[in-house]
């Protein structure tokens, strides 16, 4: 289904514009979950239509210096991925949450009405992902090999049935019970974006209106809702704000801003 005539840069332009739009809507209090669902569907569709902005894969092709696989000149790829990283540092992980097709199909799957497994092992998951990141770099620089090919990302969105496609379908099935397994355990680009979000300028924060009911902590699938959490693994999914019983107790704002 992927239309090769449409430049992959179009997907990144969509993402860069929408990061700013989503951040504004969150900041102004105008964000609605219905809009979130619309973006999830659009972004997933773009994955199948133009295979962009599939940042994990394009980041890998950039490291491999594979211009053909990247779908754009190397300098364009560098600029695009760097700008996404900068915007994540400013606004948080809206790209991962609503715009990357790999993330959006997992997010959609996570809403399946089945029992959830919510392991409070955030640091361990980040260590596992860092280990995969090292493997990713070793395979790229020493073997010029595609680490992500084993997870079938490209084959899945190109609608090609391979062993890798089956693996990625398995990831989606797992996503129904365990939130975003690829993003949290495997994605090499997420290593960089999580660092950006951890030091980010804007985050979801509790205000003085919080009554410490801990409903947000119980609802958060990545264990990032406690006071003092760095929000490195916060995908702005909205589960915490949806369940919060006090208006204004959770706000998306500049760090050190409105309370």
Tell what function each PLM region has:
Residues 1-223, 233, 241-259:
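Non-ligating segments of multi-cofactor redox enzymes
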């Amino acid at each position: 289904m992927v239309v090769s005539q449409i430049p992959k840069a179009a997907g990144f332009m969509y993402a860069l514009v929408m990061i700013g739009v989503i951040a504004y809507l969150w900041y102004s209090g105008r964000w609605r979950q219905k809009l979130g669902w619309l973006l999830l569907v659009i972004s997933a569709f773009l994955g199948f239509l133009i295979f962009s902005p599939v940042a994990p894969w394009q980041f890998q092709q950039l490291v491999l210096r594979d211009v053909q696989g990247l779908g754009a000149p190397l300098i364009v790829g560098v600029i695009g991925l760097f700008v996404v990283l900068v915007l994540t540092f400013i606004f948080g992980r809206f790209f991962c949450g609503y715009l990357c097709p790999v993330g959006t199909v997992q997010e959609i799957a996570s809403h399946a009405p089945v029992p959830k497994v919510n392991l409070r092992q955030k640091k361990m998951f980040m260590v596992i992902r860092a280990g995969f990141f090292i493997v990713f770099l070793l395979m790229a620089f020493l073997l010029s090999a595609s680490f992500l090919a084993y997870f079938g990302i490209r084959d899945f969105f190109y609608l090609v049935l391979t062993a890798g496609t089956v693996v990625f379908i398995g990831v989606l099935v797992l996503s129904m019970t365990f939130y975003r397994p690829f993003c949290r355990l495997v994605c090499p680009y997420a290593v960089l974006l999580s660092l950006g979000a951890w030091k980010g300028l804007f985050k979801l924060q509790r205000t003085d209106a919080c009554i410490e009911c801990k409903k947000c902590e119980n609802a958060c699938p990545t264990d990032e809702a406690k006071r003092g959490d760095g929000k490195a693994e916060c995908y702005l999914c909205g589960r915490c704000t949806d369940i919060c019983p006090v208006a204004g107790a959770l706000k998306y704002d500049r760090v050190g801003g409105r309370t």
